[in-house]
Amino acid sequence: MKCLIILVIFAIATTQIRAACNQQSDCPPGSCCKKPNSYMEGGCFPLLKRGESCYVKDNRIYDVYREKCPCGEGLRCHQFAEGIWQGQCVETS
């Protein structure tokens, strides 16, 4: 129970630090509007960096990303294997 309370407090604190958003244009360059989960409001988060885990397919619903931002400028999401939606941000070649 203590762990759950700590997680809820952390989620609320993290949400309040981020700028709220409802669409991509609400966020500054180098960031995206995403909802970390179904229960949280949208917030501006940094685009993914080289080596970070990403989604190969577009994961936007109504111009808000779900769970992960896309890879940053000059990067693309390289698919791990066919049939898997996740990949890793790598330099565009």
Swiss-Prot record:
Q: Does the keyword rRNA-binding apply?
A: no
Please state the span of the N-terminal signal peptide per the UniProt entry. 1-19
InterPro entries named in the record: Prokineticin_domain (IPR023569)
Q: Does the keyword Disulfide bond apply?
A: yes
Q: Where in the cell is it found?
A: Secreted
| Principal place of residence | secreted
The Gene Ontology CC terms held by the record are: extracellular region
Q: Which positions form S-S bridges?
A: C21-C33, C27-C44, C32-C69, C54-C77, C71-C89
Annotated family: Belongs to the AVIT (prokineticin) family.
What is the name attached to this protein's record?
Answer: Venom protein 164
Species the sequence originates in: Lychas mucronatus (Chinese swimming scorpion)
